Amino acid sequence: MSASAVFILDVKGKPLISRNYKGDVPMTEIDHFMPLLMQREEEGMLAPLLSHGRVHFLWIKHSNLYLVATTLKNANASLVYSFLYKTVEVFCEYFKELEEESIRDNFVIVYELLDELMDFGFPQTTDSKILQEYITQQGNKLETGKSRVPPTVTNAVSWRSEGIKYKKNEVFIDVIESVNLLVNANGSVLLSEIVGTIKLKVFLSGMPELRLGLNDRVLFELTGRSKNKSVELEDVKFHQCVRLSRFDNDRTISFIPPDGDFELMSYRLSTQVRPRVDXESVIEKFSHSRVEIMVKAKGQFKKQSVANGVEISVPVPSDADSPRFKTSVGSAKYVPEKNVVIWSIKSFPGGKEYLMRAHFGLPSVETEEVEGRPPIGVKFEIPYFTVSGIQVRYMKIIEKSGYQALPWVRYITQSGDYQLRTS
């Protein structure tokens, strides 16, 4: 079983949109949702699933809206939540921003989309590219005299339309890796993880087949193979266009791509990663009236690489004032609402070390920090580099017309949840 009805509520719990799919749950049941939500919130027991009698409310919040599905027992909760999040994604594709105003301005389109997204409580067409073929931004409906089925619905390749043409055929490939890191005050790595994605921007005519080859160091956990000195990717997820049977046989990533932007695959890598941008801080207090913080930052990556847009957030006492800064490179500013100094460095070459000194007054002479200081946060982006060593070895583009196409590859390593604890 799946959803009986779907509601979109404003921030006060008033229904803006409702769609009854099965008729087995009274639509008035939604009146119990907001009181239940507020009660659980006051009790500190808020949960994504609320119940009133035999009726269950599965809900998510997006911006100033609540999306709620009602259902009776034995429903597939994970399916319902996936549908709600996919609904948000589709609405954002149509309206850019999903909020109360965009719902009120597009009632007709919203109802049309809800009719196509779900049928008798079960998700149906949730691909926004297919939906946009016959539900337009103007809300034009299909001609009633003719039965016109969008070609992608009957096509074996539902994610790509036929007849696409470009004057210049190109494919842009982005390999992006985010580094999640937690380092203790002694410099030991407590947690480290690489989260990677391979994104494509496709401008190709016709119905091309693409074959993507990664370097030999890369190993996929789901193949069950193992070698030394390999990069073992975990939680590998592919776009629906990838031929999984071909991948299982020879690890070739073969697919007919959607048009435009899409995420081909994502992966995770649990491995010991040293800080690519490291920072150490020393704090000194003088007679409880002033404090001096010295921060040393070091680029621990190849000298030929450069980290761009580096931001180092250094925590300072909550009662600090009268800031003065001295930096060997970049600029520093005090952000009192966050109790941090942000040291910004536009370009940070590998192997370099830089210093920043900050001086503050301390008007509250009685305070002595009891709790530990918050960690230093670091943001950065290193182009032409991946921490895992993953590389695109080749991209073959095969199309029956035989045209030539150019593949472009870009590598980016960036900070994710990147924290360095201080003593």
From Swiss-Prot:
Q: What is its main location?
A: Golgi
Q: Where in the cell is it found?
A: Golgi apparatus; Cytoplasmic vesicle, Clathrin-coated vesicle membrane
Which InterPro entries does this entry report, sorted A to Z?
Answer: Adaptor_comp_med_subunit (IPR050431), AP2_Mu_C_sf (IPR036168), AP_mu_sigma_su (IPR022775), Clathrin_mu (IPR001392), Clathrin_mu_CS (IPR018240), Longin-like_dom_sf (IPR011012), MHD (IPR028565)
The record's account of how the chain is modified after translation: Phosphorylation of membrane-bound AP1M1/AP1M2 increases its affinity for sorting signals.
For membrane topology, the record states: Peripheral membrane protein
GO molecular-function terms, A-Z: clathrin adaptor activity
Database matches in SUPFAM superfamilies: Second domain of Mu2 adaptin subunit (ap50) of ap2 adaptor, SNARE-like
Give GO BP annotations, semicolon-separated. Answer: intracellular protein transport; vesicle-mediated transport
Here the disulfide bonds are none
Listed A to Z, the keywords are: Cytoplasmic vesicle, Golgi apparatus, Membrane, Phosphoprotein, Protein transport, Transport
Write out the GO cellular component annotations. Answer: clathrin adaptor complex; clathrin-coated vesicle; clathrin-coated vesicle membrane; Golgi apparatus
Looking at the record, the residues that make up the MHD domain are 168-421
User: Family, per the entry?
Assistant: Belongs to the adaptor complexes medium subunit family.
- Quaternary context: Adaptor protein complex 1 (AP-1) is a heterotetramer composed of two large adaptins (gamma-type subunit AP1G1 and beta-type subunit AP1B1), a medium adaptin (mu-type subunit AP1M1 or AP1M2) and a small adaptin (sigma-type subunit AP1S1 or AP1S2 or AP1S3). Interacts with P2X4.
Summarize the protein's role.
Subunit of clathrin-associated adaptor protein complex 1 that plays a role in protein sorting in the trans-Golgi network (TGN) and endosomes. The AP complexes mediate the recruitment of clathrin to membranes and the recognition of sorting signals within the cytosolic tails of transmembrane cargo molecules.
Protein's name according to its UniProt entry = AP-1 complex subunit mu-2
- This protein's gene is called Ap1m2
